[in-house]
Curated annotation (Swiss-Prot):
Family of this protein: Belongs to the MsrQ family.
Taxonomic lineage from the root: Bacteria, Pseudomonadati, Pseudomonadota, Betaproteobacteria, Rhodocyclales
Classification via InterPro entries: Fe3_Rdtase_TM_dom, MsrQ-like
Topological category with respect to the lipid bilayer: Multi-pass membrane protein
The encoding gene: msrQ
Name recorded for this polypeptide: Protein-methionine-sulfoxide reductase heme-binding subunit MsrQ
Length: 233
């Protein structure tokens, strides 16, 4: 049976989800305050914010498959919050590195980037997240158009790939299990995306094949569904 929440229920679900997204940040804030993050609290905080960036990014990517499997189309209305939460934790991850780890020392940061390329990969992932966060509104969809907006937001998969590479490169060989699990989950999500595209479009189009119209319809509908109907003035 398909569950379709009323507007009031959906508002309650969004409020509950928002509160849940705050829990990791509150946990680490309490850990800093109570000095319970271990021998190297700054490293624990930086890594924790990075892991939760990946967690919320992956939850964002899971929305479309879950909507398809369950028939709960209202899940799209939660995707923007999850995506912006991933960006917020990405900002905290970057901030803890620049401020608490490097103390805004530009020379030290430059040397760190040169010696530790995984930081460059992480920074690239963050830079790719910026336009996605800045274009997460109805105004952005109207300005860009549904097709271009959807094409831009496919960069979320590149962000996820770079995030996993960043994590794999960061950890030591004895601690590879967690990033490998993220890599496997990402492979499943990417595989689902490819299968879904083939199902909608047929085989990958060649130059002589005219572009299909149907995917554009889905793009517009999904973009609007993810943000909710704009209020009429």
């Amino acid at each position: 049976m398909t569950f379709q929440p009323t507007p009031r229920q959906l508002s309650a679900i969004k409020a509950a989800l928002f509160l849940l997204t705050l829990l990791p940040a509150l946990h680490y804030a309490h850990g800093l305050w109570s000095d319970s993050l271990g021998a190297n609290p700054i490293e624990a905080l930086t890594r924790g914010m990075g892991i939760w960036t990946l967690n919320f990014l992956f939850l964002t990517l899971c929305v479309s498959p879950l909507r398809k499997l369950s028939g709960w189309h209202w899940l799209l209305r939660l995707r923007r919050m999850l995506g912006l939460t991933a960006f917020a934790y990405g900002c905290l991850h970057l901030l803890t590195y620049l401020w608490l780890d490097q103390f805004w020392d530009v020379d030290a940061i430059a040397r760190d980037i040169w010696k530790r390329p995984f930081i460059t990969v992480g920074a690239t992932a963050f830079l790719l997240m910026l336009p996605l966060a800045l274009t997460s509104s109805h105004a952005a969809i109207r300005s860009l158009g549904g097709k271009r907006w959807q094409s831009l937001h496919r960069a979320v998969y590149a962000v996820a790939i770079l995030g996993v590479v960043h994590y794999l490169w960061l950890v030591k060989r004895v601690a590879l299990l967690d990033p490998i699990i993220y890599a496997l989950v990402l492979a499943i999500l990417l595989g689902w995306r490819v299968v879904e595209r083939i199902r909608l479009n047929g085989p990958w189009p060649t130059r002589s094949t005219p572009p299909a119209v149907q995917p554009v319809v889905f793009m517009k509908r999904d973009a609007v569904a993810a943000l909710g109907e704009p209020k009429k003035r």
